[in-house]
Amino acid sequence: MSQLIDRRQNAGKKSTVNRQRFLRRYKSQIKKAVSEAVGKRSITEIDQGEQITIPAKDIYEPQFHRGHGGHIERVLPGNDNFIAGDRIKRPGGGGSGGAGGNASDSGEGEDNFVFELSREEFLELYFEDLELPDLVKKELARISTYKTVRAGVTTSGIPNNINVLRSMKQATGRRVALASPYKRRLKEAEEELERLKQLANPDKLDILKLERDIEFFKKKIQTVPFVDTIDLRYNHRVRVPSPSTQAVMFCVMDVSGSMDEAKKDIAKRFFILLYMFLTKNYEKIELVFIRHHTSAKEVNEEEFFYSRETGGTVVSSALELLNTIIEARYPPQAWNIYVAQASDGDNWNADSPYCQELLQEKIMPLLQYFAYIEIMPRHHQSLWEVYQQVKERYPNFAMENIDNVADIYPVFRELFKRKTV
């Protein structure tokens, strides 16, 4: 049996299949190295490839080889320094070994295996098993828009949908099926008539009968219509549900004076991961960036991550702007709306109850998911407490705490992990 090997997806490299097999085999070691690399990178370097090191012991494979026991005397080809019976000195440097490995007493060692992950491979491993949670509407498991698609042909329809080619094929087949018996009998009658006419004394009654039969068969053939109504075929189109993944993700970040550079760096890392994750997995997702201190404003991606503007803390300003943008541009009937907010938890005490009111009465009924991360290595403040009350009321509200850079990856996965059925 023949076997086809399709290498069109190998990007012009014959070793791609072997590389993919290697990545699958040592996936756990590679994913561990990837998660460690994320914590060491700056935001601008997060979407680059990575040099991965795998300890030699992890890629060791058992091998069959000759045993070292017994007594063997032999002289290998090409030897011009020794003869049988000579004693060879042990090589020096018995403590040599691989980089990062233990010393060897045999003069041999093995380095760790180092290779480069491409940007695509790095992101694929990093974002594996992640999915924007609950991409559903409130009423249905999936939002469905309908589109019209071809579904073959049918025997009924309107003239505009006539399939001429299929109709003519059907008519040809019908004419052949109906006329063939008469054509065969017509041919036999004509041959018999020709034979009788060549006789010296033919029977005139037989000739007359054959002539009548021939005329009858010709009329029967002519009465077969060229196209009949039963031949007509119409293009059949049906409406099928088309799942909608039209979503908008609001990224809300606190840039007030209480957010020091370390906290801002953690928040920026979280949002850049979120941004990369969304753009990698979903083509029809819009991102809206809102940064706030005492006032909030919608900004572009560059200003969201790198602007140095700062001030006090009024979280409700961001929530009010969020609600205004949703009402103006993203009707919940047409959009799946998600919000991710990063803050240190500091807020004007009198403002926190208003934030709770905004979320519970106006914003949460419009959303599919709200993810809140609080960058707070110490005790939580009033904002966390009111958000806890929102979480108890709305199951689509999630909140997690981040203490340092090392917590970003686990928290990110927890907030956006793929749910199993």
From Swiss-Prot:
Q: Where are the bilayer-spanning segments?
A: none
Q: Which family does it belong to?
A: Belongs to the UPF0229 family.
Segments of skewed composition (Gly residues): 91-101
Spell out the NCBIfam families in the cross-references.
Answer: PRK05325.1-2, PRK05325.1-3
Which residues does the annotated region (Disordered) include? 83-110
Superkingdom of the source species = Bacteria
Q: Which InterPro entries does UniProt cross-reference here?
A: UPF0229, vWFA_dom_sf
Query: Do you know which HAMAP family this protein is assigned to?
Result: UPF0229 (MF_01232)
The name of this protein is UPF0229 protein lpl2726
